[in-house]
């Protein structure tokens, strides 16, 4: 009798648990009311392409003007984090539909000082089944053709910190919580894959917030910023300060000659001639 009763109670508990698990997931639109410390969600919209949905394409350095299209349904969440007085870290989190999700998260960075969401990378990642997110690193550049990005944010300490490391961390923390609310379970593995300043962001994540990711790819990291910027400015002023009239101006037509000379001098240093310089020292 006791055995039958225990089996009955176990079955009842199991049936009661089913709706609890089901309701742990949230609809895309309900994520707009999700509460996360110092985070405001401004949009949560289900995107159902038919056949394709075209994403925004900021006019910024390093950005292609080719249209960005997505062909799989997903939940698009936008918001911002304000962890400090002058912080406003804009971000977007894209979540593939549950039956297309690979249970992984892929964070992505941005090049240089660019203050834009990396929509092209978001589109690429969502097609592969990743929950994915990108931030503007705490500032927004102009979106006017022919105009250079603004730099006023560089005089605001909070925004410099956001660009330097806090923006990516805040975005990752928010993305994890948004993802968990949407799918009703935590991310199995979290990765970072980005290059240039995104590679530098990878290194700062690894150094300051090692708990954010299970694996990190830091492509051509633009680190050692003080030296990097000093050399960049010197080379720019020396080579193109006065355009073609600069004493050190090097015309584009001679680039292939320089490229060949560098390969001839350095390619074999790593033991293999393959047109790739693995050891520039």
Region locations from a protein language model:
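N-terminal secretory signal peptides that target proteins for export/translocation
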Residues: 1-5
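Bacterial N-terminal signal peptides
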Residues: 8-19
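Catalytic-loop region of hydrolases
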Residues: 23-104, 117-120, 259, 277
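Cap/lid segment of the alpha/beta-hydrolase catalytic domain
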Residues: 102, 107, 111-187, 230-231
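A catalytic-pocket lid/entrance helix-loop region that shapes and gates access to the active site
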Residues: 160, 204-206, 211-281
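Alpha/beta-hydrolase fold nucleophile elbow
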Residues: 185-196
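Glycine-rich nucleophile elbow surrounding the catalytic serine of serine-hydrolase chemistry
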Residues: 195-204
């Amino acid at each position: 009798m006791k055995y039958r009763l225990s089996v009955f109670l176990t079955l009842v508990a199991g049936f009661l648990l089913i709706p609890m698990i089901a309701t742990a997931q949230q609809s895309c639109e309900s994520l707009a009311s999700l509460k996360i410390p110092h985070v405001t969600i401004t949009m949560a919209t289900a995107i159902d392409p038919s056949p394709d949905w075209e994403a925004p394409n900021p006019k910024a350095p390093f950005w292609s003007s080719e249209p960005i299209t997505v062909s799989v349904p997903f939940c698009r969440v936008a918001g911002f984090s304000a962890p400090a007085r002058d912080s406003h870290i804009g971000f977007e989190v894209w979540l593939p539909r549950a039956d297309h999700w690979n249970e992984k998260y892929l964070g992505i960075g941005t090049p240089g000082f660019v203050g834009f969401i990396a929509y092209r990378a978001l589109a690429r990642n969502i097609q592969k089944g990743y929950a994915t997110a990108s931030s503007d690193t705490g500032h927004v550049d102009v979106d006017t053709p022919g105009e250079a990005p603004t730099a006023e944010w560089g005089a605001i300490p909070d925004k410099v910190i956001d660009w330097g490391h806090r923006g990516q961390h805040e975005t990752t923390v928010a993305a994890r919580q948004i993802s968990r609310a949407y799918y009703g379970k935590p991310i199995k593995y979290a990765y970072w894959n980005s290059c240039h300043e995104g590679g530098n962001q990878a290194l700062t994540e690894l150094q300051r917030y090692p708990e954010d990711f299970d694996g990190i790819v830091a492509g051509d990291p633009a680190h050692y910023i003080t030296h990097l910027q000093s050399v960049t400015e010197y080379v720019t002023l020396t080579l193109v300060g006065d355009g073609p009239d600069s004493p050190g101006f090097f015309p584009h037509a001679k680039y292939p000659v320089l490229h060949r000379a560098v390969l001839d001098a350095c390619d074999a240093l790593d033991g293999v001639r393959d047109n790739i310089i693995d050891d520039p020292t």
